[in-house]
Amino acid sequence: MESNARYYSRRAVEERMKAQRAITEPARTWHAKLAHDFAERATACTETAKAAVSA
């Protein structure tokens, strides 16, 4: 099973690629926003996991 951090990281990459391929500006903006949101979630999951291990 894929971890949350890995899933969010993968989705961030997918959305960045979609943003680069988008034809319209609204689509590019939307995919870039999703990429940013998924990247933040991946970072949060990683930080939470590190905190749990060191506690």
Language-model segments: residues:
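Long, non-catalytic architectural segments outside compact domain cores
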Residues: 1-55
